[in-house]
Amino acid sequence: MDEVLIGEVIKPHGVQGEIKVYPITDNPKRFRKLKEVILVQNQEQRRLKVLHANVHQSEVYLTLEGINTRDKAEAIRGWAVKADRDQVPPLKEGWYYFELEGMQVYEGDVLLGTLAQVIQTGANDVYLVKGDKGEICVPALKTVVKHVDVAGKRMDVELPPGLIDGEELR
């Protein structure tokens, strides 16, 4: 099953094993609906039931089955927190970054490369596309991104004039 990175364990909270999690989302309230998380560090994975999730502003606190002391919570400090893809609610519009990363990006029939990273700039996101000829920063604008096929892992773009030297990639 596909897993999605949703946060990182920052530190224990209290003495009964509750953990503070740094959420990797713009909506931390999503943690309240989780039934289970996967804690990951290096090659080790632990799948644990979520007993309670508390969200205060942008801070997330989780109580997990089997983590019931401060020492056990301390032992998972720095671990990645993941969830099964089917626990991530669909967006009303748009895509999650993890759905975009790894897509093949095309302009017409020309493969520009693979979308390696979504960069948040404030004004609009930028897609960092890495290909045989180097890196291209593609603005995430409706005028540029013409089609996204999440299932097919393909994005079609129409680059603005002057963004790249067209002959370099063709």
Curated annotation (Swiss-Prot):
This is Ribosome maturation factor RimM. The keyword rRNA processing applies. GO terms for cellular component: cytoplasm; ribosome. It comes from Desulfitobacterium hafniense (strain Y51). InterPro entries: PRC_barrel-like_sf, PRC_RimM, RimM, RimM_N, RimM_N_sf, Transl_B-barrel_sf. Keywords: Chaperone, Cytoplasm, Ribosome biogenesis, rRNA processing. Binds ribosomal protein uS19. It is found in: Cytoplasm. The PRC barrel domain binds ribosomal protein uS19. An accessory protein needed during the final step in the assembly of 30S ribosomal subunit, possibly for assembly of the head region. Essential for efficient processing of 16S rRNA. May be needed both before and after RbfA during the maturation of 16S rRNA. It has affinity for free ribosomal 30S subunits but not for 70S ribosomes. Residues 92-163 form the PRC barrel domain. It holds the Pfam family RimM. The gene is rimM. The keyword rRNA processing applies. One of its GO terms (molecular function) is ribosome binding. Belongs to the RimM family. GO terms for biological process: ribosomal small subunit biogenesis; rRNA processing.
